[in-house]
């Protein structure tokens, strides 16, 4: 085991704080409508330009092990917020930095870190309650477009595209973002279905950079039982290989010899194949397999129907123009099913929704209906160069996640104003002075996103924040894009509550851990042994006797 270096107390916290600052300072320049770009050097290909906080955070790795620990903890804040809300990563990073900074000062002044943490938790709980109470529900397509525009750094067209996509496939529909072959960004709605099962083995992946398995013009084998014996599958596999088309297997499970053989064939390049588990459980699994069969024009291979795997022919397999499989989801696009069959199935599910008395069953049936009838909206991102397309795609991903979050929990005034207002409304008291100090840390930290947005726009943060707080109306704030004050919601500057809430909760959670850290352990850097000295040269002028 390698020797470790241990740092305690103040020296540990100082190192950690330096790491937090390096990462947060790189991320926070991207905040707001006038946020700046960050250029990231790639080991291959052109550098990447982005305004996406989590993309910047993920690239940062520091040489000093202790500083790196601090940076990685804050990177965790950005990733967690991104996973849950899909946006707000920069806000979360700014909040985490502010709480850690203030907290470290308080600990250095001799306060109890655990009491500070309790105070922080009390304040955060009150702010979250206040945010949820202030939330305004989203009803119109225009409001959806406004949320999308803000998250895309003020690009109106992106907001409009997302609003249109949501209108076409419904709020629960599936919307994917792809790179276009042209310079224009366009929206396309494709009939399709997505379910929450990913590939059974990472060896099925065709795009290692994104960890996605893409199958074009694929056959689909639907089997309701487990597949473990390869022998029964051989006839259908051989028939598919003859066609040169890829095959997707959807079964209860694929294991043992069957899975191993499929993987080996995929790696050798003889067979383009992927396998996923069937979605759902029990009777619902049968129904969902039947849905997929109707969508793709295939047949579910089921012993109940007297169909054996050995006797399966190509015409029993479903067909789809494209299948995309990630670690968690499978999307089937443009199935070869008959329109009349799909409409019949939709009508049948609608009738079941009418009849059912269970809320849970109704919800699951509506999910199936959305998958069959809603389809998949694809936003194809265009641009003059590859770098521009990637940067735009990042922003559209953020905007899409933000709009979904807004539809779920509602919206509040944007531009950091909601948190600014909540900072004044914190009334909770701790059990002692140290807990009160924790509450005050949150009170001050809540101003940091608004201040950062104003600073990035080149204005004086203290003056702007003072002016906003002078007015006692919730929606009054500062538009950093135009430099005007006014009603934020009327100006279309709004944030989804889910994004703001998640950013604060994740930031406070990680910042509290950093404040309560008293020791840090890291491996000592390896010292390379010095090279062997060169041999002595021959000594001239000395003849042998």
From Swiss-Prot:
It catalyses: ATP + H2O + a folded polypeptide = ADP + phosphate + an unfolded polypeptide. It is an enzyme of class 5 (isomerase). Induction: By heat shock. GO terms for cellular component: cytoplasm. The keyword Transmembrane does not apply. InterPro entries: Chaperonin_Cpn60_CS, Cpn60/GroEL, Cpn60/GroEL/TCP-1, GroEL-like_apical_dom_sf, GROEL-like_equatorial_sf, TCP-1-like_intermed_sf. HAMAP family: CH60. Forms a cylinder of 14 subunits composed of two heptameric rings stacked back-to-back. Interacts with the co-chaperonin GroES. Together with its co-chaperonin GroES, plays an essential role in assisting protein folding. The GroEL-GroES system forms a nano-cage that allows encapsulation of the non-native substrate proteins and provides a physical environment optimized to promote and accelerate protein folding. Belongs to the chaperonin (HSP60) family. PANTHER family: 60 KDA HEAT SHOCK PROTEIN, MITOCHONDRIAL. NCBIfam families: GroEL, PRK00013.1, PRK12849.1, PRK12850.1, PRK12851.1. This is Chaperonin GroEL 1. It comes from Rhizobium meliloti (strain 1021) (Ensifer meliloti). The lineage of its organism: Bacteria, Pseudomonadati, Pseudomonadota, Alphaproteobacteria, Hyphomicrobiales.
């Amino acid at each position: 085991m390698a020797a470790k270096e241990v740092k305690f107390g103040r020296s540990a916290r100082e190192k950690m704080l330096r790491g937090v600052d390096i990462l947060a300072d790189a991320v926070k320049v991207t905040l707001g409508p006038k946020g700046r770009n960050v250029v990231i050097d790639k080991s291959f290909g052109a550098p990447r330009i982005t305004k996406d906080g989590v993309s910047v955070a993920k690239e940062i790795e520091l040489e000093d092990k202790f500083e790196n620990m601090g940076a990685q903890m804050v990177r965790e804040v950005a990733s967690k917020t991104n996973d849950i809300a899909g946006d707000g990563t920069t806000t979360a990073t700014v909040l985490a930095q502010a709480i850690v900074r203030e907290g470290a000062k308080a600990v250095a002044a001799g306060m109890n870190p655990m009491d500070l943490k309790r105070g922080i938790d009390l304040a955060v709980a009150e702010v979250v309650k206040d945010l949820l109470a202030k939330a305004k529900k989203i009803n119109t397509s225009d409001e959806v477009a406004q949320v999308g525009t803000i998250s895309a750094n003020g690009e109106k067209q992106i907001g409009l595209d997302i609003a249109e996509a949501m209108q076409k496939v419904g709020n629960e529909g599936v919307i994917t973002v792809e790179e276009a072959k042209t310079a224009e960004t366009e929206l396309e709605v494709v009939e399709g279905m997505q379910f929450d099962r990913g590939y059974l083995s990472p060896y099925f992946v065709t795009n290692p950079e994104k960890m996605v398995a893409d199958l074009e013009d694929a056959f689909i084998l639907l089997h309701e039982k487990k597949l473990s014996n390869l022998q029964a599958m051989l006839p259908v596999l051989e028939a598919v290989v003859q066609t040169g088309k890829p095959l997707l297997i959807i079964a209860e499970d694929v294991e043992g010899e069957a899975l191993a053989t499929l993987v080996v064939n995929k790696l050798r390049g003889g067979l383009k194949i992927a396998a996923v588990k069937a979605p759902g459980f029990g009777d619902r699994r049968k129904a969902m397999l039947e849905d997929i069969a109707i969508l793709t024009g295939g047949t579910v291979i089921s012993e109940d129907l007297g169909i054996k795997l050995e006797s399966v022919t190509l015409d029993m397999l479903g067909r789809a123009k494209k299948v995309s499989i990630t670690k968690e989801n499978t999307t089937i696009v443009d199935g070869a099913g008959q329109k009349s069959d799909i409409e019949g199935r939709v009508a049948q599910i609608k009738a079941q929704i009418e009849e059912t008395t269970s809320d849970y069953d109704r919800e699951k049936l509506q999910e199936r209906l959305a998958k069959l009838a809603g389809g998949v909206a694809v936003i194809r991102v265009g641009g003059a160069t590859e770098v521009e397309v990637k940067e735009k795609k990042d922003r559209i991903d953020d905007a899409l996640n933000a709009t979904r979050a807004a539809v779920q929990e509602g919206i509040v005034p944007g531009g950091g104003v909601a948190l600014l207002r909540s900072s004044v409304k914190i009334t909770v008291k701790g059990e002692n002075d140290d807990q009160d100090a924790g509450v005050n840390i949150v009170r001050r930290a809540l101003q940091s996103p608004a201040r950062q947005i104003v600073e990035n726009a080149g204005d004086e943060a203290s003056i702007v924040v003072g002016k906003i707080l002078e007015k006692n109306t919730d929606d009054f704030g500062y538009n950093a894009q135009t430099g005007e004050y006014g009603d934020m919601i009327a100006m279309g500057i709004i944030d989804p509550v889910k994004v703001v809430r998640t950013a604060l909760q994740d930031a406070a959670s990680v910042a509290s851990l950093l404040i309560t850290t008293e020791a840090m352990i890291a491996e000592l850097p390896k010292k390379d042994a010095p090279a062997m000295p060169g041999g002595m040269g021959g000594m001239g002028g000395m003849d042998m006797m």
